[in-house]
Amino acid sequence: MAGWHLDTKMAQDIVARTMRIIDTNINVMDARGRIIGSGDRERIGELHEGALLVLSQGRVVDIDDAVARHLHGVRQGINLPLRLEGEIVGVIGLTGEPENLRKYGELVCMTAEMMLEQSRLMHLLAQDSRLREELVMNLIQAEENTPALTEWAQRLGIDLNQPRVVAIVEVDSGQLGVDSAMAELQQLQNALTTPERNNLVAIVSLTEMVVLKPALNSFGRWDAEDHRKRVEQLITRMKEYGQLRFRVSLGNYFTGPGSIARSYRTAKTTMVVGKQRMPESRCYFYQDLMLPVLLDSLRGDWQANELARPLARLKTMDNNGLLRRTLAAWFRHNVQPLATSKALFIHRNTLEYRLNRISELTGLDLGNFDDRLLLYVALQLDEER
């Protein structure tokens, strides 16, 4: 029962519940004999010597008027030990004639012990949930599964050898108060942690949740399309009964040491890139954004600056962005002149003129594959797209 104890809230709940069973005052004492719950609020905090007798002798103690006069903080009544898993965790006392109360004592005690057991189980469930969340937070940072992580997982009944892929749920909690946002997050967490899903979920903050999903299907294969459908179904389902607006990004599936950490990084970057490129969308997938996600790690480094140089030259002479939009459309339509000109509502000669102008300004030959690739990569890195 490590971490659990009979506290004042639990004691007062027991008093409220049991006083509905029997019309007499009820006291609840902790394992030190102090009154921590009572129908007579003035008695809370007093040391109850009758409870000390119960705690020391481990049995029911009747207190009549004669005995009560010789004990501190005691009135006539019956005092029973409260046991949890065979251990005495407190005492419950009923005030009144012992002879009249004896037949109710066991019933009241049984009710109190059932409440204690329920409280302990809730505590264990909450503790288990916190430990699982901490494990998830460690796994998304770990480059390998250390013996300590493996032992931690085993104690929680989690198999770290099960392949997993990471999804990130980013929540817009700005429209809700803190309490409401947390309640909605916990509702979402509960929906994601049902046993049949076998997900590991951690609430990182009021705006982010991490989900470690089993990666392989029933045939032992990675099926990105199946995961896509599941994410889309989740978003549809949560729209029906939740107030939260949220986005989901799904990272890539990796194998080997540090696979979960790598999957988390791809999910994180997929979210960032997805919001930049498709702000109206609610779900983003690594497979759809693979190149810009992989290139994002270069951002800020000298390699990215070199790759961006041709496009930077184009920008200086393309104030209204017309040539860049033309270039992006050309690549989007697989460098096919007819499809590109139709999409832009321009004549093919106009398209050819613009492409020639782009070649002049960038110093690159758009008929050369390597030069095309340089410009395409530069566009992928361009934050002004």
Curated annotation (Swiss-Prot):
Which GO terms of type biological process are on file? positive regulation of DNA-templated transcription
Q: Does the keyword Transcription apply?
A: yes
> What keywords appear on the UniProt entry?
Transcription, Transcription regulation
* Gene3D superfamilies, alphabetized: PucR C-terminal helix-turn-helix domain
Recorded coiled-coil stretches: none
InterPro entries in alphabetical order: CdaR-like_regulators, CdaR_GGDEF, Diacid_rec, PucR_C-HTH_dom, PucR_C-HTH_sf
Q: Mind listing the GO molecular function terms for this protein?
A: DNA-binding transcription factor activity
Q: Which family does it belong to?
A: Belongs to the CdaR family.
Q: Which NCBIfam families match?
A: PRK11477.1
**Function (record text):** Seems to regulate the expression of the operons for the enzymes involved in D-galactarate, D-glucarate and D-glycerate utilization.
What protein name does the entry list? Answer: Carbohydrate diacid regulator
Q: What's the gene?
A: cdaR
